[in-house]
Swiss-Prot record:
Gene Ontology process terms (BP): heme biosynthetic process
Function: Catalyzes the ferrous insertion into protoporphyrin IX.
Enzyme Commission no: 4.98.1.1
HAMAP family named among the record's database cross-references: Ferrochelatase (MF_00323)
Name this polypeptide is given: Ferrochelatase
Subcellular localization, as worded in the UniProt entry: Cytoplasm
Catalyzed reaction equations: heme b + 2 H(+) = protoporphyrin IX + Fe(2+)
Domain of life: Bacteria
Annotated Pfam families: Ferrochelatase
Transmembrane annotation, as ranges: none
Biological pathway: Porphyrin-containing compound metabolism; protoheme biosynthesis; protoheme from protoporphyrin-IX: step 1/1
GO cellular component: cytoplasm
Length: 338
């Protein structure tokens, strides 16, 4: 075994469905300044208020999708890790979570102790956002610096419209699309508009409510516009699959709080599509590479119930890439070239 490790990093999960474990996880997640980007005193107060009721609600949601082996997100990421081993001959393949266990700093320290000297860090997020990619990369760099770990790092960059990634999405989703459907909704995780606006170059006007917000935008703007990258993923996928305009659309889910988030909202689109006569709705969640509470519970359970209550007949959740063989091959190749 050589000294070059591959480290796959995902968001994370509570250790269990207990209210105490969920509260601990939510506190770590929401206190990240890249997630709730407010001054510390305001963030602490807001998170403390959220933690009064949210842990019990979230614990119930986690319990509804929890597997015998544990958290679906962690289990599926470990399956991906196991599949990647034969595609990475340079050293160990490990996983880490930004929040919860296995903790990213601890995994980096363990790799260094094992004699690893180079790490390819792979944040498992196709699109760029401070609250996903930046927080992972910054924590990794901070850990290496503060703990004086003898590690050289290179980072897998966002791959939202990489042709091979789009091909992997197509290979994974094709069997589900071939069963027939009335409409395909590509539901991405949402973000507050201010998370995007603060990254745009000063003086740049960028309409985050436009149908194609990055049309004509500079490369600098496109590199930090999460909404535009999501739209690019969706458009590339629809073109790859030959899905005509009008039979697919994009929305953004998981809104939290009262701030303005990027639109259109998934909960709104579910009602609109049902009322427009869509009976069989397929939903994909391409911001996630592994199924998790946002896909299995928010869309697969609550979203399905909402769609049927609004007049639809059936909502079919298309699984994420998880450990699909084509995704494993594509991810290994992208990491090799990172």
């Amino acid at each position: 075994m050589t000294d070059h490790a591959l480290l796959l990093v995902n968001l994370g999960s509570p250790a269990s469905t207990s209210v105490a474990d969920v509260r601990r996880y939510l506190n770590q997640f929401l206190m990240d300044p890249y997630v709730v980007d407010l001054p510390w005193p305001v963030r602490r107060l807001l998170v403390s208020l959220i933690l009064i009721k949210r842990p019990e609600q979230s614990a119930h949601a986690y319990a509804s999708i929890w597997w015998e082996e544990g958290s679906p997100l962690v289990v599926l990421t470990r399956r991906l890790q196991a599949a990647m081993v034969e595609h990475w001959p340079h050293g160990p393949v490990e996983i880490a979570m930004r929040y919860g266990q296995p903790a990213l700093p601890d995994v980096l320290e363990r790799l260094a102790a094992q004699g690893v000297r180079k790490v390819t860090l792979a944040p498992l997020y196709p699109q760029f956002a401070d609250s996903t990619v930046t927080t992972v990369v910054d924590l990794a760099k901070q850990t290496v610096s503060e703990r004086q770990l003898p590690l050289q790092m290179r980072v897998l960059q966002p791959f939202y419209e990489h042709p091979a990634y789009i091909e992997a999405l197509a290979a994974s989703a094709r069997p589900h699309l071939e069963t027939g459907y009335d409409h395909l909704l590509l539901s991405f995780h949402g973000l507050p508009e201010r998370h995007l606006k603060k990254l745009f170059p000063k003086g740049v006007k960028h309409d985050l409510r436009a149908a194609d917000c990055c049309h004509g935008a500079t490369a600098e703007v496109r590199s930090v516009c999460y909404r535009g990258q999501c739209l690019a993923t969706a458009k590339a996928f629809a073109q790859k699959m030959g899905i005509p305009d009008g039979k697919w659309s994009v929305s953004f889910q998981s809104r939290l709080g009262r701030d303005k988030w990027i639109e259109p909202y998934t909960e709104t689109r579910l009602d609109e599509l049902a009322k427009a006569g869509v009976k069989k709705l397929l939903v994909m969640c391409p911001a996630f590479v592994a199924d998790c509470i946002e896909t299995l519970e928010e869309i697969g359970m609550r979203g399905s119930e909402q769609f049927v209550e609004a007049g639809g007949r059936e909502l079919v959740l298309v699984p994420c890439l998880n450990d699909h063989p084509e995704w494993v091959r594509v991810l290994a190749d992208m990491c090799e070239k990172a």
